[in-house]
Amino acid sequence: MKNIVFVLLISMVQPVLAQTKLEKALTNLENNYEQEKVYLLTDKSQYAAGDKMWFKSFVFDGYNRSALSTTLFVELYNADKKLIDWKTILLTNGEGSGDFQLKEDLPEQVYFVRAYTPYMTNFNDDFQIVKTIPVYNPNSKESLVISKSSDWSAKAFPEGGTFISGIPSKFAVRLSSKTSLPENWTGKVIDSQNPNVPITTFKSFDRNVASFTITPASGKKYQVIIQDNTGKNQTIDLPQVADSGLNLQVYSSKEGIKYTLKGANLKQQLQNYKIVGTINNHLAYKANINQLTNEATSLIPTKISNGANGILQLAIFDEQDNLVAQRLCFIKPGNLKIEKAEIIGQNIKHTPRSFNSIDLSPESYFKNYTVLVSEDDGTQNPEEENILSGLWLTGDFTTKIDSPAQYFSKSANTEALDALLISESWQRFDWNSLLSGSVPTIKTNSQPYLSYKIKPIKNGSMLINTPVSLVLRLGKNEPAINQFITDQNGYAYLNNINYDEPLDVSLFVNSENNKESGTDNLFVTVEPLVNPVAFKGNFPGTKYKLVKAGENKTLSPSISRAINTQKNTKKVENADVQIEEVKLVGKKQDPKEELDKQLSTGMFSSVNSTIFDFVNEDQHIAGSNNIFDWLQGRAAGLTFQRNNSGVNVPYIRNQQAKLYLDETATDPSMIASLPVNNIAMVKILKGAGLIGDAVLIYTMKGNMRSKSNEKETQKNNSSVIKGYDKPSEFLIETLDNDDPAKKIENDTRETLYWNPNLFDSDYVPPRIKFFNNDSAKQYKVLIISFDEDDNLLYDQEIFK
């Protein structure tokens, strides 16, 4: 038995030659196969129609949060692959959050949530996460039930992919089903020529897998008979026994990954065989066997992953760089690198609607937390999936795995995980394709945030290499003017848009010889450059089926509680609306007077004034070129005379009136160029104290909007960019209210607290705070965080 580490050291001093086929394949892998995956956390595993679905997304590049993408599309589909709703989510350090408001009339069925970055569309759709979400509706004519079908199939996988005569071989037996797998099952291995005498027997580790080891004989045909707990059985064939080849045996422990190679009837034994270990698309380990030997072993240290957990793919290549064996194994399966939250204080009560709090340490390396607090019903049902299984397992496989979270729980069976990985193959790349030089086609490159191209058309023609002005107004903020020059195709571009408020875009072209307005016959279209892509894959099978509902449809307690929570929310919201209406009716103040008080200050306030209100009244101003044109004939004693520049100048009592824009002295040309839709109020002062005769123009502030109901002809040069979807706010409030209109008889909330971004501030402890419902006696608290080095904090505790 030879030590490959020693052989590796000797091979390292050999002269550097031209790249071999394998070395080129490794370079190809490193440069072209970087890929992302998504884990999606939802606040509940099932919903009632009308619920709000809260979600938090984590995007990974390998086992670290991804820096590749800043945009995530999250889509909701029904069972017929019809798109119901979708969100564009802003990613910060690979994390983003949002919510779906489920409609009350959604039919009861299984829905699917798809989440992907634009960059992920370059690769197989099967790697885009599809989350199964059952939604219940008491008014639906059909009901979701768990299928009792026992339709499953089995397959046996030899370790390394080879089955060599005379060498002990480990097998994994894997069950699969479109619905549910049997709770437990057993099996036996037989020689087809002597079926009554089992060679070995085995029991399932879980619903997914089992394993056994046999030493095959040349010329023998072996079969496996599997029987589940209901009595159903199936017989499958093992692969044909080979007389020559290579056997790979792997054992993973906290010290590292030990592997053994055994050759049988090879021409040059294992000489010039190569062992390659990859983690995602990165080379982590490489060794060469330079001596004649039929058996070799070595220990791969955990430092290849810096001590982190993850999947290592071992691939064995012969002297001609042909792939002869491969195997997946987990690094440090019994020693998961998971941090726990540092809780420095808690105030937990069990009385209905009481206030509870949990304080986290402000001195931790972890600064931003995702926190979910739910009522725990005490059933102690294990999680089916979580961020651990998404990061280390299901995010990289397209096959269906039953309850993957079990492999990373406190009671996890490392043998079961190993058997599962024997039955899996790494499909994010194919070694034979790599060796042939195949490179994926990258049609969508990752880019920062959202981008748009703007196409102006004036008098029916594209504006090529033309200076234009873009006026950008974000939400309720003041507009900003930006100068652009269109390219040779007539486009201007807006890049790096990372807002979650609507962005108003208006484009203006410099007029020629002052003969034509910059917006006359000008049309503008805005086209997004970062777009969702139609789903081409297939939804996974589920354990649910639809049956015709009976006359008295029964609902589970959790769904009944969810529906009652919706009723409570509506009651409170309706009461708030009624109270607000009463306030508005009781106020009875003159809106014009209120606007004047809001905008006018000091010496500009005068009783002797004429006010035109454009915020609360429709002044039909849209057809006017400027405010001076509109004012003509509307105020007694106010006249206009055209100056040398052709601008109308206001006069009061045959004297030129002073002009003020937002109470700052200005000239007529400035006022004449002001867009009329930006004007909130015009005030005419006659003999007002220190000011005298004056015309005061006030522009829109904050959330003011023009009352004009007329269609504005100038809007052809404008468009609105939606940007990212802004997450709703999860309200933290008590339903314990003495107001009869808001009185809630039974608080049945399941989700008591949801915060996708809890963080500390100036060394103040991050505080988890929530109000109890009427029934909870204990709470399930989930805390997730990553530090700057992407170390994972995952803590789920029950507080009693």
Residue ranges and their predicted role:
Residues K52, G96-L102:
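Ligand-binding face of N-terminal immunoglobulin V-set domains in extracellular IgSF glycoproteins
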Residues T42, D191, I279, I652-N654, ...:
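Structural motif
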Residues M1-T27, L360:
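Bacterial Sec-dependent N-terminal signal peptides
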Residues L29-Y33, A48, K103-E108, T117-E183, ...:
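Surface-exposed, low-complexity/disordered segments
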Residues Q46, L76, V189, I226, ...:
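Short aromatic-centered micro-motifs
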Residues V647-K686, R705-N716:
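Periplasmic plug
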Residues Q19-E36, L41, Y47-A48, K52-I89, ...:
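Contiguous segments within soluble domain cores/interaction surfaces
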